[in-house]
Amino acid sequence: MERGIAKANRDWLDAPFDEWNGNLDGRVHRMSQEHAQELCVAMADMLSARDALIMSLVSGAPTVVDTKAMLDLASSPHDPANVIHLYRLLDRAFNDADCLPDRERCVCGIDMLESMADQVSGRFEVQPLTVAAYGSWWLGSDDALDYAKRALELDSQCTLARIVASAVAQELRPAWRLKC
């Protein structure tokens, strides 16, 4: 049964993740409505889909987090190889001062996320806004707190939005931003 669910999630997210990555690589700031809405539903139902989008933003390189890696994480988030990959990527992004962001790629993703949130309502807005908050915080953008607050207005229990808001308030930042 578990493999059937993982396969169904892979099949469902393959085209939306592929468009997402293609748009990041090509600096296209808006997704098709169908795929945008599918990602909003996926993020609302599976936080691993949200985490895959975050990975694609903070990695800064399509060779690190391609569509296959995103599908692996979203469909099998507890697989040890996926846990290790996510941990290593996030650890490097936070703690390696030489791990600089691909600013244009990240801004492109934030723009797509904002557009996604505008296409849906209620609980389906929360995670796109939260990922936009996270990406904005990671870049050092003043928009981070606004995105986090918008997400929290919709769901006051959204843990990641609360973490982003707290990080902004405490002036916490990734290592690369400490160098600047």
Range-by-range predicted roles:
Residues 1-180:
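Charged, compositionally biased boundary regions
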